[in-house]
Amino acid sequence: YKRVANPLNGVGRVLLVHRTKGLLTRLNSMKNHTKLCHGDYCPDNIIVTADAKGNIKEITAVDWVHATQGNASADIANTFLLLKLQFGDKSDIPEKYINAFCELTNTKRSYVNEWLPLVAAARLTKNKEEEKELLEQWINVVDFQ
């Protein structure tokens, strides 16, 4: 048994507890849905079949291991975040994706945005150092458009 010093002492611990409570309060206030959610819908899990001219014939989502029943807006927010992590600000793909979903489903963008801190916090648990800064920004955002 070896005792390890807790790096979350003092102010850091208070801030973490406050942020966690805020995220849990937000999560508990979100509507429950029964939609099929992929859980990891990103370019790596999409197979596009095209003809010789490059016309799309079929789009198939693969890797359904993270599939759940839940709120589709949470799944969309997660995909948006994955696209932002992959493409950063050098592509408009994340914005086009989330805007298309909102338009096709008559969902307010602000509602999908409410999920961003929650999915960012979930992603942060994967401990990928290269993602930490962006995820922290999404978690700390309070007001959305």
Label the model's feature ranges.
Residues 13-17, 73, 91, 95:
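Short, structured helix-loop boundary elements
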Residues 9, 13, 43, 66, ...:
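Alpha-helix N-cap/helix-start and coil->helix boundary motif
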Residues 4-7, 66-67, 86-87:
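Short histidine/acidic/glycine/proline-rich micro-motifs that form metal-
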Residues 1-39, 47-52, 56-60, 142:
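An alpha-helical support segment within catalytic cores of ATP-dependent transferases
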Residues 28, 63-67, 111:
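A general structural-boundary detector
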Residues 69, 77-145:
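Helix-rich C-terminal or lid/interface subdomains of diverse kinases
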Residues 44-76:
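Catalytic activation segment of kinase domains across protein kinase-like and atypical kinase folds
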